[in-house]
Amino acid sequence: MRPSKRAADEMRAISFERGVSKHAEGSCLVKFGDTHVLCTASLEEKVPGWMRNTGKGWVTAEYGMLPRSTGERMRREAAAGKQGGRTQEIQRLIGRSLRAVVDMQALGEMQITVDCDVIQADGGTRTAAITGGWVALHECLRWMEARQMVRVEKVLKDHVAAISCGIYEGVPVLDLDYAEDSVAETDSNFVMTGKGGIVEIQGTAEGVPFSEEEFGALMKLARSGIDRLVSLQKMAVA
């Protein structure tokens, strides 16, 4: 029995609230159960130096956690003077995931930065950030389209979403919260497009290796979860 009493293939309650920032061109507050992430998409009409005069745009991401997003207060990384390795890994993952579904040529020489700030963490912050980040990116492109800068459907080729899966007490389960994630025998994150393409898979065994059969079960769970997330994204931006 899962601590949350959810079925093995049951996700937490998922919600997207658009337009939560009056300043950002695109924004979304995404909730995966008790994991809440504020995603904002900011437009700059310039690109990094190494992309100038290419005719192509760029999408990048940054990630952070508020000090009291966790059970005990975390020290701000800015106070330490540098970002931790985990933060750098996650924000690179978010950026890669979003770029996988963006046509940089259609975007033109502009950059969109998607900032993902964890307000409350209960497992799966990176998957929530990717999934909500897509909604914020869509809203930014919609803002640009209203000003005849781009066409959303030309720039954004597909949906992208992410979900965690793991083996908890010997059973493959979908969308782990912290109580499960902290003791799971296997923990994995799947990033996929709306058309079923795989962007990234991260999988780690804790103590006991997992079998190919178990990996297949996790993949099946992930696909069902991604399908549901994409449906919710479509409803959110409709």
Curated annotation (Swiss-Prot):
Stated family: Belongs to the RNase PH family.
HAMAP family noted in UniProt: RNase_PH
Sites where the protein binds phosphate: 86, 124-126
EC identifiers of the protein: 2.7.7.56
Domain of life: Bacteria
Alphabetical UniProt keywords: Nucleotidyltransferase, RNA-binding, rRNA processing, Transferase, tRNA processing, tRNA-binding
Protein name: Ribonuclease PH
Coiled coil: none
Keyword Isomerase found: no
One of the protein's GO biological processes: rRNA catabolic process
Function: Phosphorolytic 3'-5' exoribonuclease that plays an important role in tRNA 3'-end maturation. Removes nucleotide residues following the 3'-CCA terminus of tRNAs; can also add nucleotides to the ends of RNA molecules by using nucleoside diphosphates as substrates, but this may not be physiologically important. Probably plays a role in initiation of 16S rRNA degradation (leading to ribosome degradation) during starvation.
The reaction(s) this protein catalyses: tRNA(n+1) + phosphate = tRNA(n) + a ribonucleoside 5'-diphosphate
CDD domains: RNase_PH_bact
SUPFAM superfamilies xref list: Ribonuclease PH domain 2-like, Ribosomal protein S5 domain 2-like
A Pfam family per the record: RNase_PH
Organism of provenance: Brucella canis (strain ATCC 23365 / NCTC 10854 / RM-666)
Family annotation (NCBIfam families): RNasePH (TIGR01966)
